[in-house]
Design a protein with these regions (language model features):
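Conserved AMP-binding/adenylate-forming
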Residues: 1-61, 67-70, 85
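Generic structural signal for well-ordered beta-strand positions
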Residues: 15, 56, 62, 79, ...
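AMP-binding/adenylate-forming catalytic core of the ANL superfamily
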Residues: 23, 28-29, 52-137
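Conserved C-terminal "lid"/linker of ANL adenylate-forming enzymes
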Residues: 104, 129-165
């Protein structure tokens, strides 16, 4: 076998867990960094990817987010901001968004197509109301903030979330 995958979950078919991999194609560790290597590998040699997901019966993996991005809801629910962001980003007039936890409330930061438009705040608020009708109570957006410029990104074009928390 070239690569093995497992989900670290009590029920990987129904409950999200961390996706872990093992095989000849997986790195053996970080160069001259034993501490980082120990942190990323389990005791039995599986590499923690940091991705969270589930399996289906055919062996397909469904990624729901990153463990470091997960937000713990008010009653201990796992909230995956990427899933909410995908919905926001598909709405008219939205270029990109991130969902953050501020004082135990979910806030959507949205960069719109036309940040200078006088109606943009009202439009994004209407999007929030519509979106919340599709979401469980614990993952509903409490407020929206329109940001005037694109989010700062990594070289791989991922939003630098830590700048906006």
């Amino acid at each position: 076998q070239q690569c093995q995958v497992r989900i670290d979950s009590e029920d990987p078919y129904k409950k999200d867990g961390e996706i872990q991999v093992k095989g000849i194609n997986v790195m053996i560790g970080y160069y001259k960094n034993e501490e980082a290597t120990k942190a990323v590998f389990t005791e039995d040699g599986w590499m923690r990817t940091g991705d969270l997901g589930i399996l289906d019966r055919q062996g397909n993996i469904y990624i729901h987010g990153r463990s470091k991005n997960m937000i713990l809801g008010p009653s201990g629910q796992n909230i995956y901001p990427e899933e909410i962001e995908d919905k926001i980003n598909s709405m008219p007039g939205v270029v990109e968004s991130i969902v953050v936890d501020r004082d135990h409330k979910l806030v959507a930061l949205i960069f719109p197509e036309n940040p200078g438009d006088n109606n943009v705040v009202a439009m994004m608020e209407a999007h929030r109301v519509a979106l919340n009708k599709q979401l469980p109570q614990y993952s509903q957006i409490a407020s929206v903030e329109v940001v005037p410029q694109e989010f700062e990104k990594t070289p791989k074009k991922s939003i630098k979330r830590f700048l906006y928390s």
